[in-house]
């Protein structure tokens, strides 16, 4: 199930099917950032559901208070220091090798901080 959220932190109750329609409800939500994930918390509880028993929630970017929220948020941690270092190295290389510095593809591995907003899916 894909949810499109217009505002960076807004996730509304009407986007989730009610508890009685469990077959049509997602078992997990992977939000594109932690603020949207935390916005999901309110919508989920307003539906009478619990995290992570009914729905697991995962964010992306590990904002400062994600681990201190009422239900610590499982989130993907970007290697921001490494991103900065690699970006600076690429920029220096391009400056020192104009005008046709080669294109570089760089893949950095994120980390998953598993906290208490996720659990094993109880349904098939």
Predicted segments — roles?
Residues 13-123:
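Flexible loop/turn connectors
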């Amino acid at each position: 199930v894909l949810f499109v959220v217009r505002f960076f932190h807004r996730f509304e109750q009407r986007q989730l099917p009610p508890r009685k329609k469990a077959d049509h409800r997602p078992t997990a939500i992977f939000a594109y950032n932690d603020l949207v994930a935390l916005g999901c918390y309110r919508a989920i509880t307003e539906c009478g559901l619990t995290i992570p028993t009914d729905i697991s929630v995962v964010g992306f970017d590990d904002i400062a208070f994600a681990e201190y929220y009422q239900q610590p948020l499982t989130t993907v941690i970007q290697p921001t220091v490494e991103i900065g270092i690699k970006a600076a190295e690429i920029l220096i290389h391009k400056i020192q090798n104009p005008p046709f510095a080669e294109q570089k593809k760089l893949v950095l591995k994120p980390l998953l901080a598993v906290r208490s907003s996720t659990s094993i899916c109880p349904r098939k």
